[in-house]
Amino acid sequence: MRNVFYLLLLVVMLAGCKSTKNITSSVPVAEPCYLSSKLQLTIPSGSDGSITTGGTMKMKGGERVQLSILMPILRTEIARLEITPDEVLLIDRMNKRYVRASRKELDDILPKDARFSKLEKLLLSASRPEGKAELSGKELGIPSLERAKVRLYDFSSKEFAMTPTEISDRYTQVP
């Protein structure tokens, strides 16, 4: 009887030494990264001239990047470029036409290292104080526009609503 009492006392004491901490293996869900900025686009034209216009850039990390090019003075959208990991959509608002190309269709045109993740890294890097905020066409993976420049400024990382661009029936698809 005395041995049973000591055994019971030992079990109670060992149970009291149990740790109250629980190990959880849940991985926190990463929130999407939001980034927006104003932009200035300079495209060479003719022998010595160039065209400069403004616009906006919006990025929702891992999902899409939208560039809206605005007409000087009137500030209406004249073109939109929407890039996702799977496709690129370019809309010419002035001439009411658009081009939609899948990643597979662009593999022959773009350099091999042109990836959506690389574009995201460039844009995030440009938003940092020590980052390079002026990018050339070559750095953006568009060798045919290597002399073109995009300057990004007035960055914000506040969350915003961004929906995929819808194209109305008034627009003609360019093959």
PLM regions: where:
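Sec-dependent signal peptide recognition
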Residues: 2-8
